[in-house]
Curated annotation (Swiss-Prot):
Fe cation binds at C96, H138, H142. Its EC number is 3.5.1.88. NCBIfam families: pept_deformyl, PRK00150.1-3. It comes from the Bacteria. Signal peptide: none annotated. InterPro entries: Peptide_deformylase, Peptide_deformylase_sf. The keyword Iron-sulfur does not apply. It comes from Desulfatibacillum aliphaticivorans. This is Peptide deformylase.
Amino acid sequence: MALLDIVTYPAPILGKPCKLIEDIDEDLVCLVEDMTETLYDAPGLGLAAVQVGVDKAMLVYDVAEDENSESTGLKVLINPKIVHTEGKVTSENEGCLSVPEFRADVPRFACVTVEGVDHEGKPVKIDAEGLLAIVLQHEIDHLEGKLFIDRISSLKRSMYKRRVAKALKAEG
């Protein structure tokens, strides 16, 4: 296993939809292992393949069921798709490994149903609410070429983009 570099905004790959995965092969299994190590090292709740520079529709996540549990264990979703949404909620203080040093309130659905396949190619259907619903929406957005800053007000988004441009200019 290896730690992977996390791609950050404004990298162009983050703004492009990912390619669907057709075969689960040894390379994909290695990618899952490397993404898992990277997720826990970061630390984060979820990580999409595109966030480590891989143009594949896959994500890994590990979300505690409630405040008292440590973890539900790592889950892998390949070619995930949101098939049902319900209710509205604001994800407070949402952040992202690819959008460092910025957090914002983000409008999300309160409940989602997600379908995809796991790392063994078995069909998966997840009915999620609460934090899990927010994490799944956030990571699936990555696979569709969207960042959470694309879902916030244009004023907050442009403030962040200006800050990043200024920092990049200062770096040379």
